[in-house]
Amino acid sequence: MELSSPSREECPRPQGRVGIMAASLMGLLLLQAASWASGARPCSPKSFGYSSVVCVCNATYCDSLDPLTLPDPGTFSRFESTRSGRRMELSLGTFQANRTSKGLLLTLQPDQKFQKVKGFGGAMTDAAALNILALSPQARNLLLKSYFSEEGIEYNIIRVPMASCDFSIRIYTYADTPDDFQLLNFSLPEEDVKLKIPLIHQALKMAQRPVSLFASPWTSPTWLKTNGAVNGKGTLKGHPGDRYHQTWAKYFVKFLDAYAEHNLHFWAVTAENEPSAGLFTGYPFQCLGFTPEHQRDFIARDPGPTLANSTHRNVRLLMLDDQRLLLPHWAQVVLADPEAAKYVHGIAVHWYLDFLAPAKATLGETHRLFPNTMLFASEACVGSKFWEQSVRLGSWDRGVQYSHSIITNLLYHVVGWTDWNLALNPEGGPNWVRNFVDSPIIVDISKDTFYKQPMFYHLGHFSKFIPEGSQRVGLAASEKNNLDTVALLRPDGSAVVVVLNRSSKDVPLTIKDPALGFLETISPSYSIHTYLWHRK
């Protein structure tokens, strides 16, 4: 990446020892300033011919950030990523008492309060774990630090598949012995014990913030299913409350027990990953079908009371875990029944059909109907559609898709946003049905190298700066504009504003904080910025 400098006058050569010392000191200060301005270690860029670059990491080098500190009162920090190659680069500025520029004005409205944030993260699938563990210990450590440490983007959510999914290299459940209704042969295989669990522990040790785990099942054991297969059209045999449904509910408790024995405890479970998938003939990978009515009765009679009467009564239960296109209908069916509703903490949504389902008509309407049931984005990835290339190393647009989705979700009351695989190989796998997709980190095992994509940094513009407990507040625009913007107040009282410019035009703008004054800035074309300042 070439860095251009502004034109400048030549400085006269310093004379004598004092001059040399002054020049040396100035050089050191400039170097230090450059280090401060670009994080602890800058991106090592590489282009693969797409719209932007990846940052290359290996056993000896990886770009990193400084631990986050609040700027001095009356000043702000600005973190910038651009299509041209900047990656979360820090600069500082000062609030002004008066506004001097024209154009767009964004006014912080701290008294207009909305949802509190749970957090941001990704999924520790079998595929992700296999790729991460294939790296040398040094490179692996840097990858996990990039996601979870203060030097990285500080994820605080990890999704854990319950047994196999498409991003596994074999098909298995935790209870494959037929007719084992007491689940006496339930056990965690090597995928959990040797892959996922050690990596999750390593991530938790690195994190300065508490990390919340949530789990989702793809399929039950085949002997509990109507079609006797992990995939295709099939549901649980029988009806809610019977031994098939009760056994499946007990399976959740057994899973939580097994992970607790490894000292891992869960914040939440989802009732089923994409329950609509198992209603389709020929569905290619692990699934278990539920209609909304079936899920309603299942929650009310099986996992709801089973979890409530177990040692895991504090584990939250999330319904849906499927496309938001199914809202508000699914919520209306499930939550209309008080017996089901009392067990449901939240509604999990996936992003894959968002282009068919406007946020206002789905998320907005669901929040209007059920304001006390939280909305949570539980899965997203790019490259899954049949017309999309699986992996596009360095694609800026794919990062933009992430940040645009996160801002839209935040504006419509969603409390968290979860990416899919934490890491994949250059093909977008492994995946046993070859359902290859993209990931914010791509691992090239042959070179003991991993690539941090624009998606990684777009996510980081939220995850690093918006800790759990932050609350979205109002941000009023003086005129119609093409920027995506959102504002939040952190638990420490500081303010965060994220500005995404998806357009080809630079946009001059001013952010007004009624308590401090005016922050005058520019949102360059194809850029994302996070602004942070102290309000107390």
From Swiss-Prot:
Entry keyword set: Cholesterol metabolism, Disulfide bond, Glycoprotein, Glycosidase, Glycosyltransferase, Hydrolase, Lipid metabolism, Lysosome, Membrane, Signal, Sphingolipid metabolism, Steroid metabolism, Sterol metabolism, Transferase
What GO terms in the biological process aspect are recorded for it?
A: autophagy; cholesterol metabolic process; glucosylceramide catabolic process; lipid glycosylation; lysosome organization; regulation of TOR signaling
Question: Would I find Hydrolase among this entry's keywords?
Answer: yes
What are its GO cellular component terms? endoplasmic reticulum; Golgi apparatus; lysosomal membrane; lysosome; trans-Golgi network
Methyltransferase as a keyword of this entry, yes or no, is no
What Gene3D superfamilies is this protein classified in? Glycosidases
The catalytic site is made up of E274, E379
> Glycosylated where?
N58, N98, N185, N309, N501
Recorded catalytic activity of this chain's protein: a beta-D-glucosyl-(1<->1')-N-acylsphing-4-enine + H2O = an N-acylsphing-4-enine + D-glucose; a beta-D-galactosyl-(1<->1')-N-acylsphing-4-enine + H2O = an N-acylsphing-4-enine + D-galactose; cholesteryl 3-beta-D-glucoside + H2O = cholesterol + D-glucose; a beta-D-glucosyl-(1<->1')-N-acylsphing-4-enine + cholesterol = cholesteryl 3-beta-D-glucoside + an N-acylsphing-4-enine
Entries under InterPro entries matching the protein: GH30_C, Glyco_hydro_30, Glyco_hydro_30_TIM-barrel, Glycoside_hydrolase_SF
Q: Which residues form a coiled coil?
A: none
Pathway annotation: Steroid metabolism; cholesterol metabolism; Sphingolipid metabolism
Signal sequence bounds = 1-39
The cysteines covalently paired via disulfide bonds are: C43-C55, C57-C62
Q: What is its main location?
A: membrane
Q: How does it sit in the membrane?
A: Peripheral membrane protein
The protein's GO terms of the molecular function aspect are: galactosylceramidase activity; glucosylceramidase activity; glucosyltransferase activity; steryl-beta-glucosidase activity
Give the EC number(s) listed in the UniProt record: 3.2.1.45, 2.4.1.-, 3.2.1.-, 3.2.1.46
Q: Which Pfam families does this chain map to?
A: Glyco_hydro_30 (PF02055), Glyco_hydro_30C (PF17189)
Where located?
A: Lysosome membrane
- What job does the chain carry out? Glucosylceramidase that catalyzes, within the lysosomal compartment, the hydrolysis of glucosylceramides/GlcCers (such as beta-D-glucosyl-(1<->1')-N-acylsphing-4-enine) into free ceramides (such as N-acylsphing-4-enine) and glucose. Plays a central role in the degradation of complex lipids and the turnover of cellular membranes. Through the production of ceramides, participates in the PKC-activated salvage pathway of ceramide formation. Catalyzes the glucosylation of cholesterol, through a transglucosylation reaction where glucose is transferred from GlcCer to cholesterol.
**Would you identify the family this protein belongs to, as annotated?**
Belongs to the glycosyl hydrolase 30 family.
Please describe the quaternary structure of this protein: Interacts with saposin-C. Interacts with SCARB2. Interacts with TCP1. Interacts with GRN; this interaction prevents aggregation of GBA1-SCARB2 complex via interaction with HSPA1A upon stress.
Could you tell me what this protein is called? Lysosomal acid glucosylceramidase
Organism of provenance: Sus scrofa
Task: Name the gene for this chain.
Answer: GBA1
